Amino acid sequence: MSAVARVVERVRDLSTPEGPGRAHVCRPADSRGTVVLGHGAGGGLRSLDLTVARDVLVAAGWTVAVVEQPWLVAGRRVAGRPPTLDAAWVPMVAALMSGRSRLPRPLVVGGRSAGARVACRTAAELEADAGLLLSFPLHLPGRPDRLRDAELALAPDPTWLVQGTRDPFGTPTELAPYVPRWAEVIEVSGAHSFPKGAGPALVAAMTRIAAALPG
């Protein structure tokens, strides 16, 4: 049975300058805070690492919101450019954290792949208290000369990264020189998308992170 089987998932429609977005919110009765996660450019909301992160964090008492970018809600197959992703993400997270139905702080921002990049670029604007980056894409496959280390440097303090040992977008070894001193990398056997067999290792990684998150 899923760790969130007893928690109702509520879907919230969210307005953005880039079109309608959506959030899938799981909120336990007594919440330690909120983790908002974004999906990757492939658009998978049910990737293994996102699913495990949600389940483990909710079981540990965190409210978790998995946010759909407008391009995915609209049924498009190609993700928007980084500026449009940021322009949609910021008001969606702000809406979740404000108003009569606001989710509780502290706020942890993150996501997988492209979603992790968005979370880093916008963390300061959203006054995030911590970060959770899954499969951070340091570079395109075969292009280690074009790094996204400047984005990684914007990750909030503290931040945790869960990275596949064979990720063609950047292995833990490749990440090491660029990881901020306030961030920790947890290695999990796998590539950019984790196989089902990585489930136990991902659960262990997320359990460790859940215990360390500020809240």
Predicted regions and their residues:
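A conserved short beta-strand
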Residues: 127-139
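Catalytic histidine-centered segment of alpha/beta-hydrolase-like enzymes
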Residues: 190-203
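Acidic catalytic loop of the alpha/beta-hydrolase fold
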Residues: 165-169, 192-194
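Gly/Ala-rich beta-loop-alpha elbow adjacent to hydrolase catalytic centers
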Residues: 111-115, 119
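Short beta-strand immediately N-terminal to the catalytic nucleophile in serine-hydrolase-like folds
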Residues: 106-111, 134
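Serine-hydrolase catalytic machinery in alpha/beta-hydrolase-like enzymes
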Residues: 12-106, 118
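Short beta-strand/loop motif that positions the catalytic acidic residue
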Residues: 154-156, 161-163, 167
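Catalytic histidine neighborhood in serine/cysteine hydrolases
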Residues: 65, 180-193
